[in-house]
Structure formats: structure tokens, C-alpha cells
Swiss-Prot record:
Gene3D superfamilies for this protein: P-loop containing nucleotide triphosphate hydrolases (3.40.50.300), Translation factors (2.40.30.10)
Coiled coil residues, start to end: none
Region described as G1: spans on this chain: 14-21
Residues bearing PTM N6-methyllysine: K261
Name of the protein: Elongation factor 1-alpha
Taxonomic lineage of the native organism: Eukaryota, Viridiplantae, Streptophyta, Embryophyta, Tracheophyta
Chain positions with N6,N6,N6-trimethyllysine modification: K79, K187, K306, K396
Taxonomic source organism: Hordeum vulgare
Function: This protein promotes the GTP-dependent binding of aminoacyl-tRNA to the A-site of ribosomes during protein biosynthesis.
Modified residues (N6,N6-dimethyllysine): K55
Length: 447
């Protein structure tokens, strides 16, 4: 075992039939932690079902099914290694809640890999007004995903095959769109690939000898190393709370910022419940401290399971503890709402792990979403494609933070009619001081 590689998270985005599953499956298959025996059994099963063409996507389908069926979240299956990084694929797209997951995502992606269908008609469908290519790229940028890699996929099926002119045409059009969204297209590699045949995924392909840039694997290796927010105060949104016989109450979640360690006195927002952390575990091993990105369970003393809920946030009681938000102001982009959104609108907000109805109390301004310039003060409504600053009031106690200070707790999806109608980033929060919150004996001793 050499030195542990740096971990990065990747989100794979793009239109429905662009080949996301095949490309992701291929990487995991060739570079990943899937046991060869497992793959052979998949291959056999795929062949029996005449799904040979689907081999790589099939890998992902099997993994998805296993992930949905079992409670064991074997994240190792979603990993692959480059020379420099250990990469985790955060969410396998194609999921109905993909956009919601991307926002509340258990994690901030370090890089978005945008898969484009280069075939005749395929590219046009993806980039059209209704296609998801634009929406996903805009989302990635709004949510602070710094790096973007574009894969011009299905190069084996262009007319003629492996067509340079088709590649050039796509690069030109996608670059101009990415520029509108906010990315610098000169910093975005465009890699012509075939996720199915394997061209330029890992090794250079002689079919594409006109292309001199990096392969997909090399492009991933060239991502700048991300900075991790371990210096910030602790924020750990709870995903679940378990009662474990002989141990007690164990909240589970992902450290978003800061560190958590045994002996620390934590305060849970929004209620202000304060207690001592007895132990911290990851993958059944005790930790001396857990860092941002770690999915952990931690044991707390004298706290009933009913006192903690999904969406609560653990924080260090001595370092900017988490508090309930009385109201907050956010920059919101309306993505797919059939009508007009005006003051009083009360959809559900998905922010980190919480899922709470929030009232749009006051639409303060309408802005140009690219430049941020104000277009109109106190507009009557916002509609599709509009962006604006909105003051919001939660209908139940919830914890949110500014995007600038705690990014994962400062971005949200607005859900209505079973879809994501808008996304937002929080600019300012007015907090409530907790009243009458329970402080356990263990925590008092520590004071």
C-alpha cells in the first residue's frame, strides 16, 4: 500500500441517451474496485439475456439494483482510480431525482463530466431547449462545481465514423453555451470518445488520431487538487438516526465541513440539543477524528432517538454552533415551473438532508443570472429562466447557512409537482437563538 490517493467526487451529467451509464460503467469496469468474478457473472447474465451491447451500462444497472435492494451502501463499487486520484461517482444519472440529488447531493462534486451524444440528431436533441445538457451544465455551475470535462461520446457512430468535422462542430456549439453558463471554455477539455468501444477512455485511439488532447482518464488526472474545508467549524447534516442495542443513539451523516471527534461537545441545530460525542465510526472502524467527506456514525450519550431527526445538523458547541434560521435570502433560478411564481408561493425546499416547506415571503429583485445585474426591483413574479433574490421563511424549524461560508448547506432545490422547479444559493441568514434546549449532563461536565 503506497500513500493513499487523494479522493475526488465526480458527477456524470448529460442528456438521457448520451451514454452516461455506458461511459461510467466502462470506467468502473476497467479501473474500478469491482471484483472480476462479479463482472464475469454480469457478463454471463447479460449474454444470456442478449444484452451484450449493454455490458458496461449493465454493470451500473446491477449496482443500482443492489444499492436499491440492500441497505448496505457499498460505495466501493462506485469508485475507480486514476494515477493521481481515487474517484467516486456520486450519483448515477438517469435517476428521477437526479437534479435533487445533485443539489442536496451527499457531496459536492469536484468535477462534472458532461457526456454528449455526437451522433446525428442525438446531439441536437440533447442541446435543444428541452434537452438536459444545458440544464445540467447550468446546475453544475450554479452549485459551484469548478471543473468540467466534456466527452463527445459515440464517436464510433458519427457519419462518417470518428468524424473530426462533427467533433469540431460540437466543440464550437457547446463552448458557446458553457461560456453563457459561466465556465471558461478554454479550460474545459473536449475529449472525443466511445464509451462503448473504449476509444480515448483510457488509452489513445488510432481511430481518432487527428485528436491530440488528453484521454478521459488523463483529463481526470489533470483536475486541480480540491481544497477540503476541514479548517471550518463542524457541520454534519444527519441522514438517519439509529438506536443500536448496547450502544445507544447513533446519528449518521456526512461531515460537510470541519471535523468531529470523540469527546467533542456537539450542538444539534435547529433545536440546540447539546451533548458529548462518545465515539465516531466509519465502515465499522473507530476513528480518532472524521474529516469532510467522511460518512460516519457517532454515538451520543443520554439522547433519545426521537430527539434527533434527519435534516438536523451537528456542530461544535464552542465554534459557531448551528442554529435555526428565522428567514434567509437566496439567489434563485427558476428552471421548470409552468406558471409564475409570486410572493406567498410555498414549495418544498431540499437543502442538505432536510426537506421542508418554505414560503417565498418577498421577491426582492429580478436579476440577470449571468452578470448578476438588477433588472427589476420588487417584481410581481418570476417565471421560467428568470433569476432573482428572494426572502424565504421556513414553515418548520430548519438549519441553513450561507453558500459562501458552508457551501453544502447553502444550496437548495425547490421542489413542486414532483419535480425540481428552481435551484438557489443562500446569500444571508437571520438566525434564531435556541430557547430551553436540552443540555445533557455529559455536556455540562465538559463545559
Amino acid at each position: 500500500m503506497g500513500k493513499e490517493k487523494i479522493h475526488i467526487s465526480i458527477v456524470v451529467i448529460g442528456h438521457v441517451d448520451s451514454g452516461k451509464s455506458t461511459t461510467t460503467g466502462h470506467l468502473i469496469y476497467k479501473l474500478g474496485g469491482i471484483d472480476k468474478r462479479v463482472i464475469e457473472s454480469f457478463e454471463k447474465e447479460a449474454a444470456e439475456m442478449n444484452k451484450r451491447s449493454f455490458k458496461y451500462a449493465w454493470v451500473l444497472d446491477k449496482l443500482k439494483a443492489e444499492r436499491e435492494r440492500g441497505i448496505t451502501i457499498d460505495i466501493a463499487l462506485w469508485k475507480f482510480e486514476t494515477t493521481k486520484y481515487s474517484c467516486t461517482v456520486i450519483d448515477a444519472p438517469g435517476h428521477r431525482d437526479f437534479i435533487k440529488n445533485m443539489i442536496t447531493g451527499t457531496s459536492q462534486a469536484d468535477c462534472a463530466v458532461l457526456i454528449i451524444d455526437s451522433t446525428t440528431g442525438g446531439f441536437e436533441a440533447g442541446i435543444s431547449k428541452d434537452g438536459q445538457t444545458r440544464e445540467h451544465a447550468l446546475l453544475a455551475f450554479t452549485l459551484g462545481v469548478k471543473h468540467m470535462i466534456c466527452c463527445c461520446n459515440k464517436m464510433d457512430a458519427t457519419t462518417p465514423k470518428y468524424s473530426k468535422s462533427r467533433y469540431d462542430e460540437i466543440v464550437k456549439e457547446v463552448s458557446s453555451y458553457l461560456k453563457k453558463v459561466g465556465y471558461n471554455p478554454d479550460k474545459v477539455p473536449f475529449v472525443p470518445i466511445s464509451g462503448f468501444e473504449g476509444d480515448n477512455m483510457i488509452e489513445r485511439s488510432s481511430n481518432l488520431d487527428w485528436y491530440k488532447g488528453p484521454t478521459l482518464l488523463e483529463a481526470l488526472d489533470q483536475i486541480n487538487e480540491p481544497k477540503r474545508p476541514s479548517e471550518k467549524p463542524l457541520r454534519l447534516p444527519l441522514q438517519d438516526v439509529y438506536k443500536i442495542g448496547g450502544i445507544g443513539t447513533v446519528p449518521v451523516g456526512r461531515v460537510e465541513t470541519g471535523v468531529i471527534k470523540p469527546g467533542m461537545v456537539v450542538t444539534f441545530g435547529p433545536t440546540g440539543l447539546t451533548t458529548e460525542v462518545k465515539s465516531v465510526e466509519m465502515h465499522h472502524e473507530s476513528l480518532l477524528e472524521a474529516l469532510p467527506g467522511d460518512n460516519v456514525g457517532f454515538n451520543v450519550k443520554n439522547v433519545a432517538v426521537k430527539d434527533l431527526k434527519r435534516g438536523y445538523v451537528a456542530s461544535n458547541s464552542k465554534d459557531d454552533p448551528a442554529k435555526e434560521a428565522a428567514n434567509f435570502t437566496a439567489q434563485v433560478i427558476i428552471m421548470n415551473h409552468p406558471g409564475q411564481i409570486s410572493n406567498g408561493y410555498a414549495p418544498v425546499l431540499d437543502c442538505h438532508t432536510s426537506h421542508i416547506a418554505v414560503k417565498f415571503a418577498e421577491i426582492q429583485t429580478k436579476i440577470d443570472r449571468r452578470s448578476g445585474k438588477e433588472l427589476e426591483a420588487a417584481p410581481k413574479f418570476l417565471k421560467n429562466g428568470d433569476a432573482g433574490f428572494v426572502k424565504m421563511i421556513p414553515t418548520k424549524p430548519m438549519v441553513v447557512e450561507t453558500f459562501a461560508q458552508y457551501p453544502p448547506l447553502g444550496r437548495f432545490a425547490v421542489r413542486d409537482m414532483r419535480q425540481t422547479v428552481a435551484v438557489g444559493v443562500i446569500k444571508s441568514v437571520e438566525k434564531k437563538e435556541p430557547t430551553g434546549a436540552k443540555v445533557t449532563k455529559a455536556a455540562i461536565k465538559k463545559k
